[in-house]
């Protein structure tokens, strides 16, 4: 809209000078060039992302931290899912990993994409996805539908997604699902399963009393000098997961490994506030 009105503004300037000047195009052209230069000068620093590699680093490090043929369940569209789809399909990066967007499971077209890209996973989900898609159809057509039935089928399907795949594929769940939907009881794990903090994600395990190893935090995420909401989100998310992993290591008396994760936070994510009690445990 602003660009639309700017064009009319430029035309108005040209028309004014055309009737009062012998060289009607010189001054308006100079004003337009000056306006462009000022816009570039005042906005370039803020909008220039040519040296920002945070999203690539975060996405690749997260996916690389998972085991082969793993399933990653998330709805971090801006930070993880859409970049991962790009790197998988354009750069052939870790195409073995199945990345499923929790929110896109609410859309019928997404199941065609899952069936095309991951027929094994989508096929096992069919007994639960087909009733959901049938209940979803009137909603997508703006017809009368049952929101209670739709939500019940949706929640059941998410739980079955874990249950029917966790024995054949490593299954990882992103922290936003744990902190939100699982905390509110909108998404539950199959009976007998629990979560262990891994490096960037939570891993679904059958016996949480047995120690589950994770990779060393030897990844690198390049953070830009100028922070915005997106960069801060990644910084806080990674910091929180590393702290959770450190606390998990402490639970099994792996003090040195716990220190390793905390030192990673202090060194590379200094803005993240480590819990005071955890800091004191090492002092």
Kindly label every feature range from the protein language model.
Residues 2-71, 75, 79-283:
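ER/secretory pathway lumenal C-terminal domains and tails of membrane proteins involved
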């Amino acid at each position: 809209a602003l660009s639309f009105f700017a064009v009319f503004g430029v035309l108005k300037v040209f028309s004014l000078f055309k009737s009062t000047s012998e060289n009607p195009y010189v001054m308006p052209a100079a004003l337009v060039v000056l306006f462009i230069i000022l816009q570039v000068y005042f906005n370039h620093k803020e909008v220039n992302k040519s040296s920002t590699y945070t999203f690539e680093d975060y996405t690749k490090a997260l996916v690389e931290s998972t085991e082969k043929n793993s399933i990653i369940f998330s709805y971090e569209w801006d930070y993880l899912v859409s970049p991962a789809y790009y790197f998988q399909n354009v750069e052939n990066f870790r195409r073995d990993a199945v990345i499923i967007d929790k929110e896109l499971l609410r859309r019928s077209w997404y199941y065609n994409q899952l069936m095309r890209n991951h027929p094994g996973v989508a096929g096992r989900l069919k007994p639960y996805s087909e009733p959901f898609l049938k209940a979803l159809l009137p909603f997508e057509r703006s017809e009368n539908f049952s929101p209670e039935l739709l939500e019940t089928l949706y929640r059941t399907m998410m739980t079955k997604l874990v249950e029917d795949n966790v024995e054949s594929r490593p299954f990882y769940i992103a922290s936003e699902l744990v902190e939100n939907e699982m905390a509110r009881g909108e998404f539950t794990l199959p009976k007998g399963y629990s979560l262990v903090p891994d490096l960037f994600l939570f891993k679904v395990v059958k016996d949480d009393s047995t120690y589950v190893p994770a990779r060393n935090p030897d990844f690198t995420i390049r953070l830009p000098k100028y922070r915005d909401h997106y960069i801060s989100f990644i910084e806080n998310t990674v910091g929180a997961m590393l702290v959770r992993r450190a606390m998990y290591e402490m639970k099994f008396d792996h003090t040195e490994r716990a220190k390793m994760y905390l030192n990673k936070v202090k060194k590379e994510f200094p803005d993240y506030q480590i819990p005071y009690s955890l800091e004191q445990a090492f002092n």
